């Protein structure tokens, strides 16, 4: 009886009477009878915003399959493809049709009927209430009426008048665009991003803007994500890695325009110390031209080299400060013979292709110069003060984790198939305990106040998660950037 009373008291917080409870039970049982909503698992976005957004809007072919199912014997292939294109990119397709259609009102009427049919088809897995929530605010009533039309003759005129009014009021373009967006939202019920929004692609910032507006999304962080999270938290090694990677892929629009990172200090520093250096081996790979912030190849190469040296110094300092990382083999600046221009790795000597290191003291190669310290302070401030970057990273924290119950990163294992023990900050952990602890430390790195105990160690750990051999996010033995 006591247990029943406790349950009843809990129910009473949300349901004032028995009828309210019965209503919810009926509702939940009915939902369980519906098919499971479509879940979309996608990984390794790597900043390729256009490809990713197209994949989500098209639901990886699900929408095209619905069109084939509905209109395969009714419309020609060209019309079916045009309808699909309208859903994927409504503004562009409408603009194209305006150049070729003699009477747009006829086109509008036809495609609205067709889009309603497609929308009705993709919404069959959901309750009417859930569908209504996915419809645009100002058109939800109209679309709801059209979606739940019947074949009664006395209602046909009513539905036809709705569409005629949309066209005559001059809002057909926006109505069609919103209807197309609704189809895309209904085609994918839940989106799982399994690692690496960021990397070499031109606009991870556009991907994040898109995902923030998406109705239901979660993240499993990848190592490219965590290095950005570490950079936003102010870790110098993470900042240097992020800048080096994106400069090397010519992503200046994203850095300076997208996130407002001030690269002027780095440009000035690079010209001062590498102004006579061709930096041949640091020239960027140009996959996408910058529209708003073009940077010359030589300037970019000098910036790339300047920040790469800062990266190697910052990483060396952290490796020496954290012997528990077991990354001593990545201490390479002290293995360089600066007089002869060679480096010793694993007992072998190699000649360096680039031998100009004006900011490295051979006697203390991991020490920053005063100019480098000033540069890195200014770059760190720019990352920490970027409103858009911090908003995106907070979204990654609020909607993401190191793992989820139905997927995981690279779990450290022994050769015998057992969970491998990993020592972090004096704690020896494995399996789920390791994941939970790392997840806790990543959150502490970002949200712990500056200069608080454990803040620096936690942010340093984010760098280790980017490239450490036992990192669940990396999954390899080593990162060979210098080589």
Give the role of each language-model region.
Residues 1-483:
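Feature recognizes metal-dependent phosphohydrolase scaffolds
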């Amino acid at each position: 009886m006591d247990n029943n009373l406790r349950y009843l008291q809990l129910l009473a917080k949300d349901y004032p009477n028995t009828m309210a409870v019965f209503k919810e039970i009926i509702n939940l049982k009915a939902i369980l009878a519906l098919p499971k909503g479509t879940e979309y698992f996608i990984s390794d976005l790597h900043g390729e915003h256009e490809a990713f957004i197209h994949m989500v809007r098209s639901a990886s072919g699900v929408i095209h399959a619905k069109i084939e199912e509905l209109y395969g014997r009714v419309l020609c292939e060209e019309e079916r493809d045009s309808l699909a294109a309208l859903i994927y990119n409504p503004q562009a397709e409408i603009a194209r049709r305006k150049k070729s259609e003699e009477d747009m009102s006829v086109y509008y009427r036809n495609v609205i009927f067709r889009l309603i049919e497609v929308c009705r088809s993709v919404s069959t897995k959901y309750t009417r209430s859930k569908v209504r929530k996915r419809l645009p605010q100002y058109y939800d009533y109209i679309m709801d009426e059209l979606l739940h039309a019947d074949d009664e003759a006395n209602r046909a005129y009513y539905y036809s008048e709705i569409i005629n009014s949309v066209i005559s009021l001059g809002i057909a373009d926006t109505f069609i665009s919103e209807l197309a967006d609704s189809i895309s939202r209904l085609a994918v019920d839940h989106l799982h991003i399994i690692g690496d929004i960021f990397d070499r692609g031109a606009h991870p910032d556009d991907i994040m803007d898109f995902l923030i507006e998406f109705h239901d999304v979660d993240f499993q962080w990848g190592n490219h994500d965590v290095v950005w999270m570490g950079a936003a938290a102010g870790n110098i090694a993470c900042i240097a890695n992020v800048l080096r990677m994106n400069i090397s892929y010519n992503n200046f629009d994203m850095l300076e325009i997208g996130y407002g990172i001030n690269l002027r200090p780095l440009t000035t520093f690079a010209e001062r110390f590498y102004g006579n250096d061709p930096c041949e081996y640091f020239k960027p790979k140009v996959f996408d031209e910058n529209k708003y912030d073009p940077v010359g190849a030589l300037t970019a190469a000098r910036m790339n080299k300047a920040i790469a040296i800062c990266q190697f110094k910052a990483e060396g300092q952290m490796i020496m400060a954290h012997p528990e990382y077991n990354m001593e083999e990545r201490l390479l600046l002290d293995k360089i013979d600066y007089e002869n221009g060679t480096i010793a790795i694993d007992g072998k000597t190699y000649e360096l292709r680039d031998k100009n290191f004006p900011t490295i003291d051979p006697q203390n190669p991991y020490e920053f110069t005063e100019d480098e310290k000033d540069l890195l302070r200014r770059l760190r401030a720019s990352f920490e003060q970027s409103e858009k970057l911090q908003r995106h990273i907070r979204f990654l924290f609020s909607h993401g984790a190191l793992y989820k119950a139905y997927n995981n990163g690279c779990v450290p294992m022994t050769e015998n198939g057992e969970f491998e023990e990993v020592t972090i900050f004096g704690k020896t952990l494995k399996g789920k305990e390791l994941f939970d602890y790392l997840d806790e430390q990543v959150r502490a790195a970002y949200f712990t106040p500056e200069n608080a105990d454990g803040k620096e160690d936690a942010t340093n750990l984010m760098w280790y998660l980017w490239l450490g051999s036992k990192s669940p996010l990396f999954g390899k033995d080593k990162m060979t950037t210098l080589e």
